[in-house]
Amino acid sequence: MRLRVRLLKRTWPLEVPETEPTLGHLRSHLRQSLLCTWGYSSNTRFTITLNYKDPLTGDEETLASYGIVSGDLICLILQDDIPAPNIPSSTDSEHSSLQNNEQPSLATSSNQTSMQDEQPSDSFQGQAAQSGVWNDDSMLGPSQNFEAESIQDNAHMAEGTGFYPSEPMLCSESVEGQVPHSLETLYQSADCSDANDALIVLIHLLMLESGYIPQGTEAKALSMPEKWKLSGVYKLQYMHPLCEGSSATLTCVPLGNLIVVNATLKINNEIRSVKRLQLLPESFICKEKLGENVANIYKDLQKLSRLFKDQLVYPLLAFTRQALNLPDVFGLVVLPLELKLRIFRLLDVRSVLSLSAVCRDLFTASNDPLLWRFLYLRDFRDNTVRVQDTDWKELYRKRHIQRKESPKGRFVMLLPSSTHTIPFYPNPLHPRPFPSSRLPPGIIGGEYDQRPTLPYVGDPISSLIPGPGETPSQFPPLRPRFDPVGPLPGPNPILPGRGGPNDRFPFRPSRGRPTDGRLSFM
């Protein structure tokens, strides 16, 4: 049974696999899948209603006994006074994992808005925005035949542009009440018991953002390494792609209220101590909120990210390259991974693919799942809950081909305009019925600026009718007969009216009276 669940004026699909689901089954699926996806704790109390007024009780009762069938709208009312996450609309994308494609999760600091009775609308249909990403499919790799998605899956998708995920992608972008999804996934997988464990999880994520790779083949992208906590001492080992032949080890030792982080470097079986940093867990961890929403546990992530990377990570990386006798490098290639991702996500997909063909380092950075997840959520809208092992780059490629082959994306043929309705129009058919510019006439940079149409005063009939330049006429153009600078020597035989005082036909004698200056206005 497929249902629609509405919370805070936003709607999501929910699949209930049981044959005869009960209200308890529905409540269990809401806790396990949707609440965690929205950034709430699984212990959050809520009420299930159909109209925001009458709560449904009796977990043993089947949904059919309440008249609920597939496709109905289920409304949720939160009972806990907790901040509500900034959740996207029903046509927006579901946020899943940043690096190992975990299930989506959001956590923001928005206050919970009031519920209002609204007529349920079909949230699975949306208007597709006709906006292409690029015109050449050859840059996406060899073409493959993909099976078309089912009609039911397409019913839950609405394409659009201009949407950006509201969650922070890096720790340096975090604000109060918002943490990266990768930090939330790491914290949930680490089973933290105190503030020291939570701080080590954050340190591990900062090392991953800097481009360090956990040592060991079984280390996953968004899970803590094995044996990272032994006898109260934390030990993390890493390698960096820019420093091949070396390994770095972080040994974190609790010392009273502090945690001392010692960074050591191992090159050719020789261990060197490089940097040491002391951190106060209470400055970045809320002890009284451990086990609750991850967004409420961490604080001042921007400060810790700047402090940890500037005083330990980047000096360690520079010292490693110097110890390996590697030349100093500069430019985009040697920027930290987090800066590369922040630059790449500002580009269009075609530019990202072009950068991936430059060198191996840029190819590795441009294939980061975190980046392609961001690009997919930015350029498409998909409310489908994705599995953990989603290939975001391949999914982007598939959706791009699907949108390009859609008939909605075709351009409309522009036809020439009809004959002008004004009589004696000098040129009824414009010489270029298909303007080269997409801007309307009269806009700076449009067709009007490239070929301005000025009024032609040589013909008294069409002198006030704008045309595309000089047009042939039966009347000669108005030009000076003698001196182009001085006044005209005589009246113009073409234009009507009386001549001036210097014409061949002067004014009549005034019989001694002064000339009235008002005659020229009468």
From Swiss-Prot:
Biological process according to GO: autophagy of mitochondrion; lymphocyte differentiation; negative regulation of G1/S transition of mitotic cell cycle; negative regulation of lymphocyte differentiation; negative regulation of oxidative stress-induced neuron intrinsic apoptotic signaling pathway; positive regulation of autophagy of mitochondrion; positive regulation of mitophagy; proteasome-mediated ubiquitin-dependent protein catabolic process
Omega-N-methylarginine sites (modified residues): 432, 451
Biased composition (Polar residues): 87-133
Pfam families noted in UniProt: F-box-like, PI31_Prot_N
Annotated region described as Important for interaction with CDK6, given as residue ranges: 129-169, 381-522
PANTHER family: F-BOX ONLY PROTEIN 7
Identification of the protein by name: F-box only protein 7
Organism: Homo sapiens (Human)
